[in-house]
Amino acid sequence: MLLLFDVGNTHTTVALTRDGKMFEKYRISTKKYETEDELYVFLKSLYGGTVIEGIATVVSSVVPSLNIVFEYFANKYGDGNVYFVSSTDYNKIVWNINYPKELGADRVCDVIAAYKEYGKDCIIIDYGTAITIDVLKDGVYEGGVIMPGFAMMINALFKGTAKLPLVEVKPYDGFIGKDTESNIRIGTINATVGAIKYVVENITKEYNTPPVIIHTGGHALYVQKIVDGVVDRDLTLRGMYYFYEEKKNSAC
C-alpha cells in the first residue's frame, strides 16, 4: 500500500494505491494543512487512522515549502520513507532540456506514465493552475510549454479591473459575446483552447508519425472536444507510482 500526494498550487490530490491501482482518491485544498499533525488529522477523517499508518509516502509537489510537512508526516505516522518525484532521480527517460532539475514534479509524473503506457511519442497537456504541454519524442523528453490556466486568467481580469465580474470556468458556445460574461469566457477559455490547438498542431509537425495526445487535469474534458486525444485523469498519480517502483527497485 502507498499513500500518494499530488500537491498543486491550488489543490492537492491524495490517493491510496495497491499495485498501481488507485482507490479512495480525494481532492483537497492545498491550504488545508501546514503541519504533519494537521495533515494526519485530515487524512484520518478520510481514510481512518490505521489505513494510513506505517506505509510509504510518495509526493509530487510544485510547492517546495510543504516538503518538510511530508517528511515529518512520514517519520511520525508513515514508515519513515518519503519519495519526492524529480527528473534527476529517474533515468529511464532522457531529459533533453537545459535544466532538468527545474522541471515540475507533476510534469515528470505525466511524462513517466505516458511513456510507460502510451509509448515513445506523446504530447501531454495538463490543465491545472497553469496549463503545461510536454513533448515526448522517440522516448526522449524534448521540452514543452507553460501557459496561464483558465481560472488564473479569469481571476486576473477580475482582480485587475474595477468592473469585470468573476465568471464560471466554462467554455462559451460561440466566438462573439453578447454580454460581459460571454466576452470574458471567449477571451479566456475559448481563446486558450485555440492557442493549445495551434501549439499542438505545430509540435505534431516535428514527429515522423502522429503522436498520442493525452489530456489530463481538472479541465481536460473541455479541450478534448476541440483538440483530438485521450482524456486520462489519473495520469499524474500513476506516474508517481511508476517513479516509486523504479526507486524501490534501484535500491534493492
From Swiss-Prot:
The keyword Metal-binding applies. ATP binds at residues 6-13, 129. It comes from the Bacteria. Pathway: Cofactor biosynthesis; coenzyme A biosynthesis; CoA from (R)-pantothenate: step 1/5. Coiled coil: none annotated. Signal peptide: none annotated. GO terms for cellular component: cytoplasm. The active site is at 106 (proton acceptor). HAMAP family: Pantothen_kinase_3. This is Type III pantothenate kinase. It comes from Fervidobacterium nodosum (strain ATCC 35602 / DSM 5306 / Rt17-B1). The lineage of its organism: Bacteria, Thermotogati, Thermotogota, Thermotogae, Thermotogales.
